[in-house]
Amino acid sequence: MSMPFYVSPEQLMKDRADFARKGIARGRSVAAVQYADGILFVSENPSQALHKVSEIYDRIAFAAVGRYNEFENLRIAGVRLADMRGYAYDRRDVTGRGLANAYAQTLGTIFSSGGEKPYEVELFVAEIGDEAAGDQLYRLTYDGQVADEHGFAVMGGAADTVASYLKERYAEGASLTDAVRLAVASLGHTDTEDRVIPADDLEVAVLDRTRSQPRKFARLRPARLEELLGERGPAQHAPEEPADPEPEPPIAPPG
């Protein structure tokens, strides 16, 4: 009689974490940068249909990396939660912190459950205040951990390299032009070269407190980006993202 197969809880959690991290790292980075008038989101995303950055509510935005179908489900759930809370109580009761806590609970439950695979996603939830001191930026990992970020944050892809570039050059209270140029340059930076990303390959959005409308979220189109970025030299598209690896075939037990 063969012994039952046993995996320790520690090893199981480690394997699930490694699985999620590998899936997230295969995508391209998203950078969030606080500037004088709000919060900027920049991602290299050639797709015009599939967005990594979206509006959740009046002053709240959502950004994600990883598997699109998984973070799109989370985005839709966040929009519904915000709408229901704003309708049942008051629009001011819808906060970025409350939404981040809801996402953390969902991601943590999925990660610790043995019934399904962990989500291969990381999220930003951002909210702007009437002044820069009231801005909030939360980063959520695949296992439901929440970090309160300040100044800038990066997730997905070569996040460490991009974050190091931003750390060396970031300054508080920058203009939108300076923030866009810094964020785009950081996404094109690697340890071996600096690449000029075409404006058409960029997804850029802001939470802008100076907008007169109650909804502070706005996307920056390629024409506006070209104006902000100025002359940068010849652009170069990114190499194709690696496809998901094929699963290894099972190994037959010895006869």
Swiss-Prot record:
Pfam families of this UniProt entry?
Proteasome (PF00227)
Q: Where in the cell is it found?
A: Cytoplasm
What protein is this chain from? Proteasome subunit alpha
Transmembrane segment boundaries: none
The record, for CDD domains, names: proteasome_protease_HslV
Activity modulation notes: The formation of the proteasomal ATPase ARC-20S proteasome complex, likely via the docking of the C-termini of ARC into the intersubunit pockets in the alpha-rings, may trigger opening of the gate for substrate entry. Interconversion between the open-gate and close-gate conformations leads to a dynamic regulation of the 20S proteasome proteolysis activity.
Q: In which pathway does it act?
A: Protein degradation; proteasomal Pup-dependent pathway
Assembly and binders = The 20S proteasome core is composed of 14 alpha and 14 beta subunits that assemble into four stacked heptameric rings, resulting in a barrel-shaped structure. The two inner rings, each composed of seven catalytic beta subunits, are sandwiched by two outer rings, each composed of seven alpha subunits. The catalytic chamber with the active sites is on the inside of the barrel. Has a gated structure, the ends of the cylinder being occluded by the N-termini of the alpha-subunits. Is capped by the proteasome-associated ATPase, ARC.
GO cellular component, as recorded: cytoplasm; proteasome core complex, alpha-subunit complex
Region Disordered: which residues?
A: 224-255
Q: Which GO terms describe its molecular function?
A: threonine-type endopeptidase activity
Q: Which UniProt keywords apply?
A: Cytoplasm, Proteasome
Chief site of localization: cytoplasm
Q: What does this protein do?
A: Component of the proteasome core, a large protease complex with broad specificity involved in protein degradation.
Please spell out the taxonomic lineage of the organism that makes this protein. Answer: Bacteria, Bacillati, Actinomycetota, Actinomycetes, Propionibacteriales
Protein family membership: Belongs to the peptidase T1A family.
GO biological process, alphabetically ordered = modification-dependent protein catabolic process; proteasomal protein catabolic process
